[in-house]
Regions:
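Conserved glycine-rich Rossmann-like NAD(P)H-binding loop of the short-chain dehydrogenase/reductase
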Residues: 61-77
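Conserved mid-core segment of classical short-chain dehydrogenase/reductases
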Residues: 133-167
C-alpha cells in the first residue's frame, strides 16, 4: 500500500505523454473522407443525439440515418439536418442524404428495419453512434418508497417497484446497446474501411440503478472492442449535461410524479441545476465527433474524472465523499 501514491504519480505523469501521442495519430477522415462516410445515430430525436445529427450534417458526410422512438420528433430532426446541409459552406454538404427511421433500439425488429433501410440507401455503414438511453435518479431504497426506513422492513410491493424500475432501465441502458451492437457489427465490419462505434455513457454515483445499468453497457462495449479489434470503439463519458433527459426517468413513472420537481415528496435531482452548470450539448457532441476522428477509446468529460477512477483504487473514501458532494447526496 505505501507504494500506491507513486503509481498514481506515474499515471499522472503519463497523461501529457499519452495526450501527445493521441494527437499524432492519423485522422480517420484521411482514410475515410467525410463525403463517403455513412452514419447511423440511435437516439437522435433529442438531446446530444440530435445535436450530433446537426454536426454531421454540417460536416458533409454521405448520409445520416436519424433514429428515435417518436415519429414526429424524427421528422423534425430530419428537417433540421436538411437545413444544416443547405447552409454548409460552398455546398460541401449538398449531397448529404438524411434518412429518418422511427424505432426502439431495444427492439430487434426495429433495428433490423433500420439496417435494411441503411443497406438499401448506401450499401453499408461506417459510423454507429449509440446515444439513446433512459434516466433513473433515485437510490434503490428511495424507489422502494422507504429512503429513511429504520425498521429494516421493506414490503413486497415496494421491492417490486425497484424491480420494475430496474427492468425499464436495463432495457434502455443495456438491452438497447446490446441489440444495436449485434445488429450492426457485421455490417460495419464487412462494408467499411474504417468502422467506428461510439457509446455515449455516463455512470453516475448515488444513482445505483442508473449507474449499474450504464456500467453494464460500458463493460459490454469494452468487451466488444476486444472481440472486434477492426472496429474502433469509443466510449464517451460526460458528467452532468444540460437538457431535460432526467424528466422521463423510469423511477418517476412508478410514483406517477415528475422526477425533476420532486412532486412525490422526494428531491430526485440533487445536483446543481444541469441547465446552468452542466456541459452544453454542442460541446459533448463535438467531443464525440473528435473521439471518432482520432480513434480515442475512453473519453472522460471533464478529463479529471478519469483521474478520479485511478484515485478510487488508492483512496476510495475520498472519491466517495466527493461524489456525494457533487450530487448533494446525504446517506440516511
Amino acid at each position: 500500500m505505501p507504494r500506491a501514491p507513486s503509481y498514481l504519480l506515474l499515471a499522472l505523469a503519463l497523461v501529457p505523454i499519452l495526450t501527445f501521442l493521441r494527437t499524432r495519430r492519423p485522422k480517420r477522415s484521411s482514410k475515410l473522407p467525410r463525403a463517403t462516410e455513412r452514419v447511423v445515430i440511435l437516439g437522435a430525436s433529442s438531446g446530444i443525439g440530435c445535436t450530433l445529427a446537426h454536426q454531421y450534417a454540417r460536416l458533409g458526410v454521405r448520409g445520416i440515418c436519424v433514429v428515435g422512438r417518436r415519429v414526429d420528433k424524427v421528422a423534425e430532426v430530419v428537417q433540421e439536418c436538411e437545413v444544416e446541409v443547405g447552409k454548409s459552406k460552398e455546398g460541401k454538404g449538398a449531397k448529404t442524404e438524411i434518412l429518418g427511421v422511427a424505432g426502439d433500439f431495444a427492439d430487434p425488429g426495429d433495428m433490423v428495419e433500420v439496417r435494411r433501410r441503411v443497406e438499401e440507401a448506401w450499401g453499408g455503414l461506417d459510423t454507429l453512434i449509440v446515444a439513446a438511453g433512459v434516466s433513473a435518479l433515485r437510490p434503490p431504497m428511495a424507489v422502494a418508497g422507504a429512503p429513511n426506513s429504520a425498521s429494516g422492513s421493506v414490503g413486497k410491493d415496494a421491492i417490486q417497484h425497484v424491480v420494475e424500475a430496474t427492468s425499464s432501465a436495463m432495457r434502455g441502458n443495456y438491452v438497447g446497446p446490446l441489440v444495436a451492437a449485434v445488429t450492426f457489427i457485421p455490417l460495419l465490419q464487412h462494408t467499411s474501411p474504417r468502422p467506428a462505434l461510439l457509446l455515449l455513457n455516463s455512470p453516475a454515483p448515488t444513482r445505483a440503478i442508473y449507474a449499474s445499468t450504464k456500467a453494464a453497457s460500458l463493460h459490454l462495449y469494452q468487451s466488444i472492442a476486444i472481440e472486434h479489434p477492426k472496429i474502433a470503439v469509443s466510449l464517451v463519458m460526460p458528467s452532468t449535461v444540460e437538457g431535460d433527459f432526467r424528466r422521463g426517468a423510469v423511477d418517476a413513472a412508478i410514483f406517477g410524479a415528475s422526477s425533476v420537481d420532486g412532486a412525490d415528496g422526494m428531491s430526485a435531482v440533487r445536483e446543481a441545476d444541469p441547465n446552468k452548470y452542466g456541459f452544453k450539448r454542442e460541446v459533448v457532441a463535438q467531443r464525440c465527433v473528435d473521439a471518432i476522428e482520432r480513434g480515442e477509446k475512453n473519453v472522460f468529460m471533464p478529463w479529471a474524472v478519469g483521474l478520479g477512477h485511478l484515485l478510487y483504487w488508492v483512496w476510495p473514501a475520498f472519491v466517495e465523499r466527493r461524489a456525494s458532494v457533487k450530487y448533494n447526496f446525504r446517506a440516511s
